[in-house]
């Protein structure tokens, strides 16, 4: 989700659509042990954190973009997608938003995964 968002937002001449499932939208919201290993401390590399954040590039969205997240995600917290939703609304961008209640990062259980795959497959088939 992180990479598909950044590709779509930063290279709209190349990418016409992307699906984002549980994206990291700001590395400040992610696991600091993992993030700081590669990016250093936010206090020391604030510009790097901002430059790598899809939130900093929403103005570039010109394609189709469904944003999907499980509200019980304990890996990439749903806060990431909530901030993305707000940034896209404030940038007056069209997008689709879908939340899976109480589902974790893997988005599974019952018919959940099949629903997700069917939704993504239909979106891709309609927009390629």
Residue ranges and their predicted role:
Residues 1-128:
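Active-site-proximal cap/loop segments of hydrolase catalytic domains
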